[in-house]
Amino acid sequence: ATTEIYTLSLHDALPILLLLWPLLIVMAILIKIKMPGGPAFFTQKRVGKNGKLFTCHKFRSMTVKHSGSTVSVAGDSRITPLGATLRHYKIDELPGLWDVMIGNMSFVGPRPDVPGYADRLEGDNRIVLKLRPGITGPATLKYRLEDEMISEYVAQKQKEGDIRTAQEIAEEFNDRVIYPDKVRINKYYYEHYSFIKDIQMIFCTVLGKNMKYNNEII
């Protein structure tokens, strides 16, 4: 399964990059204008296939100086107005096509974790590390509005009188609910790989549509 994913990704990434390069250039210029004082691209070490670290590329969506937390919520002060738009429409992920082209990522697969989260994988859960990380995937589709979901949870907890900071509440919800569910979904993806489902996920990502996967709507 992973060989098929890699072949599809490597062969298709270059023509897509060539097709989208004008958009990538425009986005990079827009980021430099609207978010001065920092680079257009955000790079970070992520955990790839077999636990190997690689440099992941995205368009920058946050201010240059922000906390190191990887959990964000809708309306997060670290996210700029332009960055919020890029994230909502997943445009910030387009530079990941470079990572696909050089073989570090696939079009479809689990999102690459930062080392701290990947280190939490134990037992059978570690099989997800056998997969090449993807720009999209079943967990990505299910949690495409993750920032908004976390924001709603934070607002509800604060309404109930929770005195923790918004970031602390967000991280607790992510660690307790969202991350374990993503691992569950990615394990199923590994164990029940389908090339047809991969194609369907790519189309659903581009078109913003939902699909049925493992008896749930993602």
List each language-model region with its residue ranges.
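Hydrophobic structural segments characteristic of membrane proteins
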Residues: 39, 101-218
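Residue-level signal for cytosolic alpha-helical hairpin/rod architecture
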Residues: 11, 79-82, 184
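Periplasmic N-terminal gating module of Gram-negative TonB-dependent outer-membrane receptors
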Residues: 90-94
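Short, well-ordered beta-strand elements within core beta-sheets of diverse protein domains
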Residues: 82-89, 186-191
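A hydrophobic, helix-centered structural microdomain
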Residues: 8-64, 189-218
